[in-house]
């Protein structure tokens, strides 16, 4: 009985296991079915999302691709913000022919001060290990030991006269604590119309600089990108003060930008009293930045801008809570000669594409094809336009309505423009700095020993005119040994990606400096090249350099630098000759005592000899020997005569050098003309040789 019962129990247990296993399998099957259904639903949702059409505003695009506009990191963002504001200020002042007077202030804002500005209360840390700068006791001990070894090594190097390195900064794994700066730029320019301020600064890709002309900007963003970066890094609006000439009020505007809609978001827009009758603009923006990493770039930019715009006055200030970090630099105005304002020009036929032709047709006020060709393009006269129309084919005539042209006809016009011959565009629309300003700027900032400048005539690249200006200096203050290359495009400095630039490569590889008596390794050489054009062929997304693949520009840069080198060579050769002359005089003076003594001894021996039966000397020689015998002529006499002869030869050579170089080193004498009647004030006429003055 018991055995049977046990068998029954075992059998029942087996049945229960089978039932449980089958129910488990069923559950797994249901779960797998649910998983497949969920996966299918997720795939459908993804497909549905990917099929949705999305759009981005221009502001949103540049916010997501801020590196295109030069906002790669906080340090470069600080540099680019300052640069954009300065260039806007220069454009504004030059547009009304006002000598620019620009003040730039970069103020460091501490974290606690920034939190106070935005109404955020500082909070004490609770979990120290959560933070990136947390350091355990063991790690701290290891770091201090490493720093002690480093300091010991540097002390030994200093004792031996070797170069001492700075201690490496500790780096964490995270981004670290952000640093904030208030950037302010004030100018004396045109100012902005009160009602236009929101759209001028709060709407990306809208402005007054669009058109075919020489412009400083690269993208037409200006302060708008600084505002986008401010919104991304601090969330604070930009503050604008502006007043135009003759206005009795100052426009005050506080605004930011709606990134997704690309429209301005105005917080405050009002008119305030203008007691001082000030005109210009003052922009103030608070952004995240890094002064430490880009301090040198910012100062180099200001110095190079002072070189290319010597007619402007810049006051740069950096303010910090630590007084020893404060910095004030003034770049004084050196001249009041300003370049002409760049003029807007029409398109050259060889430089247009099909899309541009369509846009010009949609915007033109001309009715027929003949008028359209004459008035919408440069270098197409009436007779030339008639010849072009005749070449287009039977479907075209001078009276053809431009609005009725088909796509095929537009392609035909475009093809003819690419193949036909046109005169090169003139450079009248360009505004180079000018040789005078470039030379003054170099002298003002570098104080070189020698300087030479050259400006090329207008040349053409793909239908766009360009002018190359170059300057080379030798010596000067704050200039390193070797080549110091300063690059400009449309009168703005280019500081990044120098290695691939056409100016750098030309200076390094295409100029044989030694043939111009210039030592490329030891001399302090400043190479300045400025290229202005209606279209600068920048390379790279950041537009920081000009490519070396454009033959016309590379050839023009090389030619301009060679012209400067030729000027310097003649000056260097004359300088070497003058140095050789001085060395020769010094050497002659050194040997005068020995020569005088030798002559005196020789003459003394001859004079002591018994007189010959037949005369061997001329009468003058006999007289000299008698004077030697009577000690009327001594060694000092010969010294004086030799010294006078050396001085005479030196004077004659100096006079010849002065006549060749155009600079007289002769003593200057005042020349006066006295007026017999009347009392007048006359200016002095000065030259390297004399001063001409009327005396009443």
UniProtKB/Swiss-Prot annotation:
GO BP terms, alphabetized: cell morphogenesis; DNA endoreduplication; DNA topological change; pattern specification process; response to brassinosteroid; trichome differentiation
EC number: 5.6.2.2
Gene Ontology, cellular component aspect: cytosol; DNA topoisomerase type II (double strand cut, ATP-hydrolyzing) complex; nucleus; small ribosomal subunit
Catalyzed reactions: ATP-dependent breakage, passage and rejoining of double-stranded DNA
InterPro entries for this protein: HATPase_C_sf (IPR036890), Ribosomal_Su5_D2-typ_SF (IPR020568), Ribsml_uS5_D2-typ_fold_subgr (IPR014721), TopoVI_B (IPR005734), TopoVI_B_transducer (IPR015320)
Binding site for ATP: 88, 187, 208-209, 217-224, 543
Pfam families xref list: HATPase_c_3, Topo-VIb_trans
GO molecular function: ATP binding; DNA binding; DNA topoisomerase type II (double strand cut, ATP-hydrolyzing) activity; protein homodimerization activity
Keyword entries, A-Z: ATP-binding, DNA-binding, Isomerase, Nucleotide-binding, Nucleus, Topoisomerase
This protein's record includes keyword ATP-binding: yes
Region (Disordered): 1-36
Top-rank lineage group of the source organism: Eukaryota
Localization in the cell: Nucleus
Segments of skewed composition (Low complexity): 20-36
Family to which this protein belongs: Belongs to the TOP6B family.
PANTHER family recorded: DNA TOPOISOMERASE 6 SUBUNIT B (PTHR48444:SF1)
NCBIfam families in the cross-refs: PRK04184.1
Biological role stated in the UniProt entry: Component of the DNA topoisomerase VI involved in chromatin organization and progression of endoreduplication cycles. Relaxes both positive and negative superturns and exhibits a strong decatenase activity. The B subunit binds ATP.
Subunit structure: Homodimer. Heterotetramer of two TOP6A and two TOP6B subunits. Interacts with SPO11-4.
Designated name of the protein: DNA topoisomerase 6 subunit B
Gene responsible for this protein: TOP6B
């Amino acid at each position: 009985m018991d055995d049977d019962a046990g068998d029954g129990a075992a059998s029942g247990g087996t049945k229960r296991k089978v039932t449980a296993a089958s129910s488990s399998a069923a559950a797994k099957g249901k779960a797998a079915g649910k998983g497949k259904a969920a996966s299918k639903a997720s795939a459908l949702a993804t497909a549905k999302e990917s099929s949705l059409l999305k759009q981005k505003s221009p502001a949103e695009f540049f916010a997501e691709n801020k590196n295109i506009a030069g906002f790669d990191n906080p340090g470069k963002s600080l540099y680019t913000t300052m640069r954009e504001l300065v260039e806007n200020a220069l454009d504004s002042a030059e547009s009304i022919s006002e000598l620019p007077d620009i003040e730039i202030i970069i103020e460091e804002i501490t974290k606690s001060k920034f939190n106070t500005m935005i109404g955020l209360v500082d909070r004490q840390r609770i979990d120290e290990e959560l933070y990136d700068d947390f350091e355990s006791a063991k790690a701290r001990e290891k770091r201090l030991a490493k720093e002690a070894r480093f300091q010991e090594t540097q002390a030994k190097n200093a004792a031996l006269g070797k170069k001492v390195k700075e201690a490496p900064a500790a780096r964490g794994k995270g981004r670290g604590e952000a640093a904030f700066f208030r950037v302010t730029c004030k100018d004396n320019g045109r100012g902005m119309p009160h009602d236009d301020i929101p759209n001028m600064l709060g709407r990306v890709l809208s402005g007054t600089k669009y058109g075919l002309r020489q412009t400083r900007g690269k993208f037409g963003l200006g302060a708008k990108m600084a505002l986008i970066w401010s919104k991304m890094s601090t969330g604070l609006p930009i503050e604008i003060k502006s007043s135009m000439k003759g206005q009795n009020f100052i426009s005050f505007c506080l605004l930011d930008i709606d990134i997704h809609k690309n429209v301005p978001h105005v917080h405050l827009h009002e008119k305030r009293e203008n007691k001082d009758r000030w005109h210009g603009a003052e922009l103030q923006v608070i952004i995240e930045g890094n002064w430490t990493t880009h301090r040198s770039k910012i100062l180099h930019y200001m110095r190079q801008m002072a070189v290319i715009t010597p007619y402007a006055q810049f006051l740069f200030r950096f303010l910090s809570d630590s007084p020893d970090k404060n910095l004030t630099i003034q770049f004084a105005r050196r001249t009041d000669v300003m370049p002409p304002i760049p003029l807007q020009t029409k398109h050259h036929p060889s430089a247009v594409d099909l899309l541009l032709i369509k846009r010009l047709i949609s915007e033109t006020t001309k009715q027929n094809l003949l008028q359209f060709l004459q008035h919408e393009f440069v270098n197409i006269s009436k007779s030339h336009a008639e010849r072009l129309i005749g070449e287009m084919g039977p479907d075209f005539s001078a009276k053809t309505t431009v609005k009725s042209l088909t796509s095929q006809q537009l392609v035909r016009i475009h093809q003819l423009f690419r193949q036909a011959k046109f005169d090169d565009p003139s450079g009248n629309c360009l505004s180079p700095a000018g040789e005078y300003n470039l030379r003054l700027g170099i002298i003002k900032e570098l104080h070189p020993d020698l300087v030479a400048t050259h400006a090329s005539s207008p040349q053409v690249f793909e239908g766009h005119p360009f002018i190359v200006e170059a300057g080379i200096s030798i010596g000067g203050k704050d200039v390193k040994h070797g080549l110091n290359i300063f690059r400009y495009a449309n009168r703005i400095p280019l500081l990044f990606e120098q290695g691939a630039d056409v100016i750098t490569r030309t200076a390094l590889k295409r100029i044989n400096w030694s043939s111009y008596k210039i030592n490329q390794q030891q001399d302090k050489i400043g190479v300045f090249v400025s290229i202005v054009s209606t279209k600068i062929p920048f390379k790279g997304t950041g537009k920081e350099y000009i490519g070396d693949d454009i033959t016309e520009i590379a050839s023009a840069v090389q030619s301009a630098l060679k012209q400067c080198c030729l000027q310097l060579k003649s000056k260097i050769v004359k300088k070497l000759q003058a140095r050789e002359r001085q060395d020769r005089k010094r050497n002659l003076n050194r040997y005068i005592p020995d020569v005088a003594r030798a002559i005196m001894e020789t003459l003394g021996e001859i004079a002591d000899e018994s007189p010959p039966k037949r005369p061997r000397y001329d009468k003058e020689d006999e007289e000299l020997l008698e004077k030697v015998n009577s000690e009327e002529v001594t060694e000092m006499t010969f010294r004086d005569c030799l010294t006078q002869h050396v001085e005479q030869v030196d004077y004659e050579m100096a006079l010849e050098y002065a006549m060749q170089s155009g600079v007289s080193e002769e003593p200057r004498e005042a020349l006066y003309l006295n007026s017999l009647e009347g009392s007048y004030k006359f200016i002095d006429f000065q030259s390297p040789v004399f001063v001409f003055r009327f005396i009443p």
